[in-house]
Amino acid sequence: MRPALSDYQHLASGKVREIYRIDDEHLLFVASDRISAYDYILDSQIPDKGRILTAMSVFFFDHLLRTAGVPNHLAGPPDDERIPADVLGRALVVRRLDMLPVECVARGYLTGSGLIDYEKTGTVCGIALPPGLGEASKFDEPLFTPATKAEIGEHDENISFAKVIELVGAELANQLRDRTLQTYTAGADHALSKGIIIADTKFEFGVDRDGTVVLADEVFTPDSSRYWRADSYQPGVVQNSFDKQFVRNWLTGPESGWDRHGNTPPPALPDDIVAATRERYIEAYERISGLSFDDWIGA
């Protein structure tokens, strides 16, 4: 159920976020406690998840702007007076942008859909890779592996850089690739200094009225990124993670009884999986930011 914010017009619902109109120039992004997996929105919710995602995004928006000069869509602090009290801590005031129709994925390691593509074709998004790679292999340099933006219930599809050029033109395509890799490198370097590997991540960008490519939506959250423990990293095996992969693993494991390739939605998550997911998200935030989640605003 989305929050009823009488002062603002509701514009759109995503898998996790609700978007409201503040005025012609600004939007209110509200992160819910919903969790999605395999293109389904699960019946279960993760307590405080929306606040954790918001706290992580605020930390990284600030870090990336200060250290790498990456512009973002924030238009006010997390306690901005335009944010209603009942969504404080899970909502942000942001600038309206012309959003670009590309999921900008950066990969530092081979896993997930990238591994599936590689095992079938020896490539990821049309990028030829050397033979002999496996689960969690580290790339010499991070890859830009874009995808389409799918509607809720549909699959994002990996696409080639040539397809990105078709969608947005060569100039913007080059900017998206360069900004994606710059942003990933800056964030991954910071995370590694805190004992966390960001194996891959997904960004969204828009263009402001001046034509600047601007980082939007969320950034380096456990929903949009794979977080691995650096001290236990071992190529060739599935890694110990802080992110949504924990939920995916339970859903596809024997305990859930769910057939991912069938036509039925996933089951509700057991209480212990809900609690463990919340703990992993909080640990990721606290390790990355050096801050206590208890001090984050809202409730």
UniProtKB/Swiss-Prot annotation:
Disulfide bonds: none annotated. It comes from the Bacteria. The keyword Cell membrane does not apply. GO terms for biological process: 'de novo' IMP biosynthetic process. Keywords: ATP-binding, Ligase, Nucleotide-binding, Purine biosynthesis. Pathway: Purine metabolism; IMP biosynthesis via de novo pathway; 5-amino-1-(5-phospho-D-ribosyl)imidazole-4-carboxamide from 5-amino-1-(5-phospho-D-ribosyl)imidazole-4-carboxylate: step 1/2. Its EC number is 6.3.2.6. The keyword ATP-binding applies. It catalyses: 5-amino-1-(5-phospho-D-ribosyl)imidazole-4-carboxylate + L-aspartate + ATP = (2S)-2-[5-amino-1-(5-phospho-beta-D-ribosyl)imidazole-4-carboxamido]succinate + ADP + phosphate + 2 H(+). It is an enzyme of class 6 (ligase). CDD domains: SAICAR_synt_Sc (cd01414). GO terms for molecular function: ATP binding; phosphoribosylaminoimidazolesuccinocarboxamide synthase activity. One of its GO terms (cellular component) is cytoplasm. Gene3D superfamilies: ATP-grasp fold, B domain (3.30.470.20), Phosphorylase Kinase, domain 1 (3.30.200.20). Pfam families: SAICAR_synt (PF01259). NCBIfam families: PRK13961.1, purC. Belongs to the SAICAR synthetase family. HAMAP family: SAICAR_synth. PANTHER family: PHOSPHORIBOSYLAMINOIMIDAZOLE-SUCCINOCARBOXAMIDE SYNTHASE. This is Phosphoribosylaminoimidazole-succinocarboxamide synthase.
